[in-house]
UniProtKB/Swiss-Prot annotation:
Domain Rhodanese stretches: 17-105
Annotated InterPro entries: GlpE_sulfurtransferase (IPR050229), Rhodanese-like_dom (IPR001763), Rhodanese-like_dom_sf (IPR036873), Thiosulf_sulfurTrfase (IPR023695)
Alphabetical list of HAMAP family matching this protein: Thiosulf_sulfurtr (MF_01009)
UniProt cross-references to SMART domains, sorted A to Z: RHOD
Descriptive protein name: Thiosulfate sulfurtransferase GlpE
Gene Ontology cellular-component terms listed: cytoplasm
């Protein structure tokens, strides 16, 4: 895959439920801690190396941001780093929270 694929929040949710696709959240730490999809890896510049060590490059990766815009650049970057299949979630976390409020968790302090 040379180009990431944009997918709907519904498609992302189904892939997430199957458990075969890695989900990364690239929002700022405060937003991530306030609420994110369970199991989402908080991908930042400082956690990228860890993510790349822990994730098989042939495992599909979905990228979530706030609204589905920033995730496009991050998805393309992950492809350039060697991941085979990368998706950008249209609508981002805002669409996820609106459609699947029962599937949001927050960090306990």
């Amino acid at each position: 895959m040379e180009q990431f694929e944009a997918i709907s929040v519904e498609q992302a949710y189904l892939r997430w439920k199957e458990g075969k696709t890695a989900l990364v959240d690239i929002r700022d730490p405060q937003s991530y801690e306030a609420g994110h999809a369970p199991g989402a890896f908080h991908l930042t510049n400082s956690s990228l190396h860890t993510f790349m060590q822990q994730t098989d490059f042939d495992q599909p990766v979905m990228v979530m941001c706030y609204h589905g815009n920033s995730s496009k650049g991050a998805a393309q970057y992950l492809l350039q780093q060697g991941f085979d299949v990368v998706y950008s979630i249209d609508g981002g976390f805002e669409a996820w929270a609106r459609s699947y409020p029962q599937d949001i968790t927050s960090e306990s302090r």
